[in-house]
């Protein structure tokens, strides 16, 4: 079973519409993989300056339900480090055994961890921003673009 963590920046600068867009974009990417939800365990984590909420999704139905029911928790400042600490603890408890990647949707204005973990990380932005320069060089920076 492969595992993926999707973290969503729920600080005051990210709207519910933006959070739902992040989830929609992720679903589009993941659903293109053959039998994705039959082989994956996906953590969806909301974080502003601390972990506000998380859910583990194992199926397409659970994903759709989560997208419909999601409420934004947080709205404070942004600190990316609690998600990395959450992952470390889940790995220590053996709840995460085969983590492939962390995808972190954000506007980029926050505190980044200093050390690279043992899994791939991508910080995903809706548009290019000055904050992208703060992303550590060991992480990917992706821009999904704005819809018109």
Name these PLM-found stretches.
Residues 117-119, 137:
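Short, structured coil segments at secondary-structure junctions
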Residues 1-59, 62-106, 109-111, 124-132, ...:
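Von Willebrand factor
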Residues 44, 121-123, 141-143:
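Conserved beta-strand scaffold positions in the cores of enzyme catalytic domains, especially
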Residues 21, 114-117:
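A short acidic, amphipathic alpha-helical/loop segment
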Residues 131-139:
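Short, charged, surface-exposed secondary-structure boundary motifs
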Residues 15-16, 110-115:
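Extracytoplasmic/secreted cell-surface and envelope-processing proteins
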């Amino acid at each position: 079973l492969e595992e993926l963590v999707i973290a969503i920046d729920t600080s005051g600068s990210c709207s519910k519409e933006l959070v739902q867009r992040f989830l929609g974009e992720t679903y589009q990417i993941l659903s293109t993989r053959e039998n994705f939800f039959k082989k994956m365990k996906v953590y969806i984590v909301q974080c502003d300056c601390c972990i506000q909420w998380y859910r583990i999704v194992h199926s397409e139905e659970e994903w759709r339900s989560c997208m419909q029911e999601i409420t934004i928790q947080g709205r404070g400042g942004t600190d990316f480090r609690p998600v990395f600490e959450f992952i470390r603890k889940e790995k220590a408890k053996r709840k995460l055994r085969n983590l492939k990647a962390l995808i972190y949707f954000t506007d980029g204005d926050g505190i980044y961890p200093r050390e690279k973990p043992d899994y791939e990380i991508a910080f995903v932005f809706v548009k290019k921003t000055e904050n992208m320069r703060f992303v550590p060089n060991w992480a990917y920076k992706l821009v999904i673009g704005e819809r018109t």
